[in-house]
Regions:
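Structural motif
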Residues: 38, 121-123
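Conserved, mostly hydrophobic/aromatic
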Residues: 34, 110, 118
């Protein structure tokens, strides 16, 4: 999994809200499942439009990489998402991903917008905390 856009949060909260505002204006909210991504991206820096490619990384792998690199995880208030930076072979990297806090903020939108529920994207990349959040707040059905 690769990305070619600029380094940024996978699903910034303002963009998620904008999509939900539009979707709920056109479709009955009770018919909408909000998708949640279960991956992050690792961008080499500096970013060069049209040249830089980010590698996909699971949220769990991102957190483990931050621990291994002793990189502090930074909370971005605007996007309501975490990221960190690290250096390898003289190249700085920025990794954006979701964690329990960012997932909880997005899951709260289901009730706020009175949506039918959530669907998770790329099963197998989930982080353990997500299952606790989902189990405590929702009835899980495999469809």
């Amino acid at each position: 999994m690769m990305a070619s856009g600029p380094p940024m949060a996978i699903a910034p909260i303002d963009q998620v809200r904008a999509v939900l505002d539009y979707a709920t204006s056109a479709i009955e909210p009770g018919k909408i499942l909000m998708g949640m991504s279960l991956y992050g991206y690792d961008w080499p820096l500096p970013y060069e439009k049209g040249r830089t490619r980010a590698s996909g990384v699971s949220n769990n792998a991102a957190q483990n990489l931050a621990i291994a690199e002793k990189a502090p995880i930074i909370w971005d208030v605007k996007s309501a998402s975490p990221y960190f930076e690290y250096m390898v072979a003289g190249v700085q990297h920025r990794v954006w991903f979701d964690d329990a806090q960012s997932a909880a903020i997005k899951l709260a939108l289901v009730d706020e917008y009175q949506l039918r529920g959530v669907s998770v994207w790329v099963l197998g990349n989930e982080f353990p905390q997500l299952w606790y959040l989902l189990k405590d707040g929702y009835t899980i059905r495999k469809v």
